[in-house]
From Swiss-Prot:
Pathway this chain belongs to: Secondary metabolite biosynthesis
E.C. numbers: 1.-.-.-
Organism: Claviceps paspali
Stated name of the protein: FAD-dependent monooxygenase idtM
Residue stretches in coiled coil: none
Entry keywords, A to Z: FAD, Flavoprotein, Membrane, Monooxygenase, Oxidoreductase, Transmembrane, Transmembrane helix
Pfam families: FAD_binding_3 (PF01494)
Family that this chain belongs to: Belongs to the paxM FAD-dependent monooxygenase family.
GO cellular component: membrane
Encoding gene (name): idtM
Length: 491
């Protein structure tokens, strides 16, 4: 049955190539259509692999190649505008609890690893921009701008935030309803409050290996991660107005330089200023940051994964890892569907894709809520977030290290591959008991932890009533503060 089932993957980046690896494990036929001229272009970005993504990569036989390219993080130093700083052990705690280091490497290098490890490289095609998809009763038909056509039993949009597949899903839904798609409708739930500058620097003086440095101040957070071979990966989150957003779309290079030059005096540690990082920058980019969960993920034989269904700030470090989880979850459901002796019909495929969306949406909404809270807490946005970020979380000392692992609880794994030996005996079972065992070292600070619950609740009540923060976000606040210290900033 697997040989008769064909998947067309639109997009050849993290989500698309991860899915290709999963399908190879299942023996399912696939084609990857990438619109770019290269699979792994140098865009100046880094990527963070956390244990939930690392475990799936290990199941696919890829993680050791990733480990060869990284310098594992050991701890993070979080600095505030008033000069106060504290040290978080979250990277070491995650490594100990889940068996995988917090791993940072060049995004280009990671995508190249994914491509190089594929057996079926001949199934990956570049310069293939999809222009239309027809979802017929027997097959879906995909057309590209060079006139080529591909048929498929399923079409997966792994083509990012500006997904063509997602646009086609909306178009098909609206045509069926007899209405037109408005320009704003598909993106109605997406926020555009921040912009991100990211880059790579080399030989930054006084910046040690194995360390994350973060500087948090009003409206801006800067995060620096030591990589392998004297490389340092960094990103800046900056609050943007509508006018700045429009300017960024017109001239991102100029705005990136202006932003970075204006932050030169920001201290990342006693010895490292951002100007030290900027002066040794080799490549950088600036982009508006989308945040949120797209409303419709699937229709008929079409489905989206990765950034085509959700966008998160990089502070939480889960964007790529959730894309890898999507690939694994979708593969698990394909495997289950193809185990039936009957040929997969259009109805069967559509039901399977509905199940996929239902399974992933709960975790997605939780993770995106945490991400939205964290980026704003890092930027001192709002009384409650400022209280949590500047005073309560640092008072827990190393507590954020153990709390960080709670975001990994409930992570997906591949069902068609064995469990890696390095995860055995670790905190993967996803029970509250395992989470509590991770936090046992907090017993000396339980009084402080109780105070955090009380004060955080009061702070969230204040924000809900007086600052018109959505009740759902307020209710998640303490869960987010626990997870947030893992997310590239610790506080």
């Amino acid at each position: 049955m697997a040989d008769d089932f064909k998947v067309v993957i639109v997009g050849g980046s993290v989500a698309g190539l991860s899915l290709a690896h999963c399908l190879e494990r299942l023996g399912v036929s696939y084609v990857v259509l990438e619109k770019g001229s290269q699979i792994a272009p140098q865009l100046g970005a880094s990527i963070g692999i956390l244990p939930n993504g690392g475990r799936i990569l290990d199941q696919l036989g890829i993680f050791r190649d990733v480990e060869d390219e990284i310098e594992p993080l050991n701890f993070a130093v979080i600095r505030y505008a008033d000069g106060f700083s504290f040290r978080s052990q979250y990277p070491k705690a995650l490594h100990s609890s889940y068996g995988y280091p917090v791993s940072f490497l060049e995004r280009q290098k990671f995508i190249q690893i994914l491509y190089d490890k594929l057996r079926g490289k001949n199934h990956v095609h570049t310069r293939k921009r999809v222009v239309s998809i027809v979802d017929g009763p027997g097959k879906a038909l995909i057309r590209t701008d060079d006139g080529d056509e591909y048929d498929a039993d399923m079409v997966v949009g792994a083509d990012g935030v500006h997904s063509v597949v997602r646009s086609e899903i909306w178009r098909h839904a609206k045509e069926a309803a007899g209405t037109a798609v408005t320009e704003e409708e598909p993106n109605a739930d997406i926020k555009y409050d921040y912009a991100c500058v990211y880059g790579i620097s080399v030989n930054v003086p006084h910046a040690d290996t194995g360390v994350q440095l973060s500087s948090l101040s009003d409206g801006v957070s800067i995060h620096l991660f030591a990589g392998k071979g004297s490389k340092f990966f960094w990103f800046i989150m900056v609050r943007t107005s509508r006018d700045e957003f429009l300017e960024l779309k017109k001239d991102s290079a100029h705005m990136a330089r202006r932003t970075c030059e204006g932050l030169g005096s920001k201290r990342l540690s006693d010895a490292v200023y951002f100007r030290d990082v900027w002066s040794r920058c080799t490549v950088y980019q600036m982009t508006p940051l989308e945040e949120g969960v797209f409303r419709q993920w699937n229709r008929g034989r079409l489905v989206c994964i990765g950034d085509a269904i959700r966008k998160m700030a990089p502070n939480i470090g889960q964007g790529a890892n959730m894309a890898i989880e999507d690939a694994a979850q979708l593969s698990n459901l394909i495997r289950e569907m193809l185990a039936s002796p009957r040929k997969a019909s259009a109805t069967t495929v559509e039901k399977m894709l509905r199940d996929f969306a239902a399974m992933q949406k709960a975790r997605t909404k939780s993770m995106c809520g945490q991400s939205e809270f964290l980026v704003r807490m890092h930027a001192n946005e709002g009384f409650g977030r400022r209280l949590l970020g500047r005073y309560l979380i640092p008072s827990l000392q190393d507590a954020p290290a153990g709390l960080a692992g709670l975001s990994i609880r409930g992570a997906v794994k591949l069902e068609c591959a064995g469990v890696p030996s390095r995860t055995l005996g670790k905190a993967w079972e996803g029970s509250w008991g395992s989470s509590l065992r991770n936090l046992m070292y907090l017993r000396p600070r339980l009084g402080i932890l109780s105070l955090v619950y009380v004060v955080a609740g009061l702070a969230m009540m204040y924000m809900s009533i007086y600052l018109v923060v959505p009740a759902r976000l307020a209710a998640q606040a303490f869960d987010v503060s626990r997870d947030g210290t893992e997310g590239k900033g610790g506080g």
